[in-house]
UniProtKB/Swiss-Prot annotation:
Subunit: May interact with GRIA2. Interacts with MPDZ. Forms a complex with CRB1 and PALS1. Interacts with FASLG.
Keywords for this protein: Coiled coil, Cytoplasm, Repeat, SH3 domain
Species lineage: Eukaryota, Metazoa, Chordata, Craniata, Vertebrata
Name of the protein this chain belongs to: MAGUK p55 subfamily member 4
The organism of origin for this protein: Mus musculus
Similarity annotation: Belongs to the MAGUK family.
Keyword Electron transport assigned: no
Ranges of compositional bias, category Basic and acidic residues: 1-16
Protein localization: Cytoplasm
Length: 635
């Protein structure tokens, strides 16, 4: 066997071992250097045995192997403290130090042992060594029967706040059980009682054989600390439900609901209130709280299913009333016309008088500084058509106590927080209010002050244009067939008939304004709000409310009202009273759709409030129906 002697020919440079690596590089750095050196010598065809011998005998590799062996022994060795009283030992050393010589080392040792950090370290060492961190429980008595159920003693400190739990009697066993735990209450925050727990004693008094009312009386008479002895439920309920927010579409008063399990735990709410649903485990009774006061504990409200069932039962229990709900609008309109007292001096003389009024009105519809802007949607014929066609429908719905609006609608509407992004279209602004409250004047002033930002949609009509009118400016003039096609295709937000002609505002007309980057302002009758509530338009509804009658008598002493009989007629006291009553009915019937309410006591103040409300609607977070922002929902 031949042995190469090339290893003896290695120069000092070739024999140079790699520089010890930086400790921060770790084992990966060492292996990387080793591979580099091996590849270098391999390329030179150097004898590997000599190289490997020198490498394995290098001091830095020997030290690394010693550290590895030490770690392995440390890993296999079970750690046992040398002493469990290191703190006592340190105190004994401190007592002996004064007897020793006063060398600098003795002084330094005294300072170290007296330092707070050193004392804390030794105390922690003794605690771990003695295993004082493990709780010591007393031994169980030997005479406990195997059949006895485990009991829990719960102590709660009751102040002026309610406990936040309801109880019930088991129908078969007669046991007193915790029926439900109210979210946010004292019991829920303690985490010690759960629905289904069996009460055995309250403050040392056995509840066996007692009625729930008697147990409630014991709790009501107790103050300070209340001690419960309970048999816990085998598996405490775990709720994984997400928080849901809804808008109430009806009024609810727990005091008037005979079916509520606990009247005191009920949560009253009004139409339009935003509720936070925190518990839907019960199919009939949910737990919720108002977002206006999230600090209080939740209350019981009927579930969506239960309220719909109540609505159906109430609807079918009412007597059939075709004269209020199903009377034709044409018959109602004729009765209303017959009931109006006509002053012959104020009746329009002929159609020319009406046309002359519209012609004068058309001149006022051009506004702007320097440049003329036309304000569409204010023609007298359109306003009279809307008022005449819709008043009868509104009157019928308001007179019917069991209106179909409340009978078939969902009692809750799920909502989410929405903020319009700068790249999105503006939200449609809808103004609602009784006739004479100033909706049209507010809309006119708003558009007139900034026509480049605000605009009304151009309505449609089937009548022929007059000589001074232009298609697409005052109206979109279409045939009756085209208009009816838009109606049946649900493309009209509102429509009606006046003097044999159809008038209305289409969805496309609103989109035309929004596509220009402007804010579309329109007024609707309350019953037409639903047709505009789509995810494309995302309307923000503002209710213009009149002040009290005495304030209106002062602010509207020179104002005039427009009717189909009177071109201009001053307000009478009965008109003001009727306006106030109609506003109350609108708010009661359709208030759940109103996002904002403005009292028009002073026109300039109301216009300023309107501008502020519109700005908030376009720029700030608002509650909107969840269907408007959900990507999986078709509007």
């Amino acid at each position: 066997m031949r042995q190469s002697d090339r290893g003896a020919e290695l120069t000092n440079e070739d024999r140079a071992l790699p520089t010890p690596p930086d400790p921060e590089n770790g084992l990966s750095g060492i292996l990387r250097l080793l591979l580099q050196e091996l590849s270098l010598f391999y390329s030179r065809d150097v004898n590997g045995l000599c190289l490997l011998y020198d490498l394995l005998h290098s001091p830095w590799l020997q030290a690394l192997l010693k550290v590895y062996d030490c770690l392995q022994r440390f890993k296999e060795k079970k750690l046992v403290p040398d002493t469990t009283h290191a703190q006592i030992l340190a105190c004994e050393v401190l007592e002996l130090l004064p007897k020793a010589s006063g060398s600098p080392e003795i002084q330094e040792l005294r300072q170290v042992l007296q330092a707070p950090h050193c004392k804390a370290l030794l105390s922690a060492h003794d605690t771990v060594a003695q295993k004082d961190f493990e709780p010591l429980l007393p031994p169980l008595p030997d005479n406990i029967p195997d059949s006895e159920e485990a009991m829990r003693i719960v102590c709660l400190v009751k102040n002026q706040q309610p406990l936040g739990a309801t109880i019930k009697r088991h129908e078969i066993t007669g046991d007193i059980l915790v029926a439900r735990v109210i979210h946010g209450g004292l019991v829920e925050r303690s985490g010690l009682l759960y629905a289904g727990d069996k009460l055995v004693e309250v403050n040392g008094v056995s509840v066996e054989g007692l009625d729930p009312e008697q147990v409630i009386h014991i709790l009501a008479m107790s103050c300070g600390t209340i001690m419960f002895k309970v048999i816990p439920v085998s598996a405490p309920p775990v709720s994984s439900q997400k928080m849901v927010y809804v808008r109430a579409m009806i009024d609810y008063w727990p005091q008037e609901d005979p079916d509520i399990p606990c009247m005191d735990a009920g949560l009253p709410f009004l139409k339009g209130d935003i509720l936070q649903i925190v518990d839907q485990n019960d199919a009939l009774w949910w737990q919720a709280r108002k977002i206006s006061d999230l600090t209080i504990c939740a209350g019981l409200i009927p579930s969506n299913h239960l309220l719909k069932r109540k609505q159906r039962e109430f609807w079918w229990s009412q007597p059939y009333q075709p004269h209020t709900c199903l009377k034709s609008t044409r018959a109602l309109s004729m009765e209303e016309e017959d009931s109006m007292k006509i002053d012959e001096k104020c009746v329009e003389a002929d159609e020319e008088t009406f046309e002359s009024e519209e012609l004068a009105e058309a001149k006022d519809e051009f506004v702007g500084d320097g440049q003329k802007f036309f304000i569409a949607g204010f023609r007298r014929s359109m306003r009279l058509c809307r008022r005449k066609s819709h008043f009868s429908q509104l009157h019928a719905s308001l007179c019917c106590s069991c209106s179909c609006y409340s009978a078939v609608g969902a009692p809750y509407e799920e909502v989410v927080r929405y903020q319009r992004q700068p790249a999105d279209k503006h939200r449609l602004i809808v103004l609602v209010g009784p006739s004479g409250v100033g909706v049209n004047e507010l809309r006119r002033q708003l558009i007139g002050c900034n026509p480049s930002c605000f605009q009304s949609a151009v309505p449609h009509t089937t009548r022929f244009p007059k000589s001074y009118e232009m298609d697409g400016r005052e109206y979109h003039y279409v045939s009756r067939e085209t208009f009816e096609s838009l109606m049946y295709g649900h493309k009209m937000l509102e429509y009606g008939e006046y003097k044999g002609h159809l008038y209305g505002t289409s969805v496309n007309a609103v989109h035309a304004v929004l596509d220009e980057g402007k804010i579309c302002i329109m007024d609707l009758e309350p019953q037409d709000i639903q047709s505009a509530r789509t995810r494309d338009l995302k309307p923000y509804v503002i209710f213009i409310k009149p002040p009290n009658t005495s304030s209106m008598r002062h602010s509207r002493k020179n104002a005039k009202i427009t009717t189909d009989y009177y071109v201009d007629m001053k307000f009478k006291d009965e008109d003001l009273q009727e306006m106030e009553e109609l506003a109350q009915k609108m708010e009661s019937q359709f208030g759940q759709f109103f996002d904002h309410v403005i009292v028009n006591d002073n026109l300039q103040d109301a216009c300023g409030q309107l501008l502020s409300a519109i700005q908030k609607a376009q720029e700030e977070l608002q509650w909107v129906p969840e269907a408007w922002v959900s990507p999986d929902t078709e509007s």
